[in-house]
Structure formats: C-alpha cells, structure tokens
C-alpha cells in the first residue's frame, strides 16, 4: 500500500491514536498504514502513507539525498539576499547544525519554492526565522517523483503503478537502515542573524539551477 494524501493544516502526522487530530483517525483507512516522515501540524500538502517499512526508511534517511519540494508564503517581500542565504546553508544553533545547500526560487512577491534533501525539525520555518521572516503558509508539493498535483485538501489517492515503478528505481540503491533521531549533520557555532549568508549560491530569481560564482565565502553543508 502506498497512498498520497493532501494533508490539511491542523492534522498531526503520527500513528499514535492517543494524539488528538492524528492522521490515521483523520483518514479512516481500512488497513493499517503509517506516515512516511512528518509534516508540521501547521503545514499542509503531500504526505505519503504506507505499510512498507523499507520504503519509509529509504525515502526518509537523510543520507539518501532524496528531494522534497515546498511552496512557502512569508510575511514580507522575498529579497535576493534572502534567497541567496536560504540556498547557501543556514546555521540553526538550536539544532546544532547548518542546513545543506539547497535550491530556492522566487515564485511571487512573498512566496518562494524550496527543494530540500534533508528533513530537520521545522527546518523551513527555522531557516526563515533566521533571516527575520515568518512563514504564513507552507505546502509540500512533491516527494521525489510523486507530486501533489490538483489533489484536493483532505483527499487521498493511490500512487499509480507508473509512479511506484519510478519510485522503486529511485530508491533501489538507497540505504534502508532505520533513521536514527540522534544522527546530525555538521555542527555550527554561528549565532542567528537577520542578514544573508554570502557564498557560492545555487539559485537566482527565476532559474532554479543557475549558479552565481561571485561570492567570497563558501558555506558548509
């Protein structure tokens, strides 16, 4: 079983029945399934659910570098400096780490698209807060090759045979070792600030794969 849900805000990504508004009670799915990773209670969008533990581990393990894509709306205009800083790695002192470099693209005056290959706790919200931004809406629109598309909020669908075949190809050589909560990327001692990080950028305004090589310092992953 592998299904794609458009999770509404307010639903908690846990199989714990004791948790109020948990996703399992919300779905009332006839068979036992559990979520592939998490999506913040306040966030919405694509959530995969399955009964296959190997798929969960291969998708979620950070070292496998699988992509997850989000559309984010913030409380003030998105600047070039903000985009460059987000793309180049953000030190999150409270988690003792610096985020990996990622791809970011402006999609509106107060909106941007971001593609991550890791899933730190409330990562995008923390990254935005570092630069003095507040997330107003966060929607996950893609996990690897599976897209949210026009699936209505609160509805789910079966992953198609074609999607599942492609997914299996993408995870064929991925580690299936269980994700360990204590596993952390490289630590950072830098304190938060409300200014952009300079360096080798992986994004400009409208071309998500273009690179700016004029930076003067290289950020760590």
Predicted feature locations:
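Basic, flexible Lys/Arg- and Gly-enriched helix-loop patches that mediate nucleic-acid binding at interfaces
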Residues: 1-221
């Amino acid at each position: 079983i592998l299904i794609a849900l458009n999770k509404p805000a307010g639903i908690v990504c846990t199989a714990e029945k004791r948790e109020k508004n948990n996703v399992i009670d919300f779905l009332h799915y006839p068979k036992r399934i559990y979520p592939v990773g998490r999506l913040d209670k306040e966030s919405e969008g694509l959530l995969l659910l399955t009964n296959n533990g190997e798929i969960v581990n291969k998708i979620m393990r950070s070292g496998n570098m699988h992509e997850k894509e989000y559309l984010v709306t913030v409380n003030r205009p998105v600047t070039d400096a903000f985009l460059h800083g987000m793309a180049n790695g953000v030190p999150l002192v409270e988690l003792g780490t610096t985020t990996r470099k990622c791809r970011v693209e402006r999609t509106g005056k107060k909106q941007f698209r971001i593609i991550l290959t890791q899933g730190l706790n409330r990562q995008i919200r923390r990254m935005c807060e570092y630069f003095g931004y507040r997330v107003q809406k966060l929607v996950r629109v893609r996990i690897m090759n599976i897209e949210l598309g026009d699936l209505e909020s609160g509805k789910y669908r079966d992953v198609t045979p074609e999607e599942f075949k492609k997914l299996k190809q993408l995870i064929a050589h991925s580690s299936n070792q269980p994700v360990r909560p204590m596993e952390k990327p490289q630590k950072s001692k830098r304190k938060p600030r409300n200014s952009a990080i300079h360096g080798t950028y992986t994004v400009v305004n409208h071309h998500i794969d273009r690179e700016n090589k004029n930076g003067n310092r290289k950020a760590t992953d």
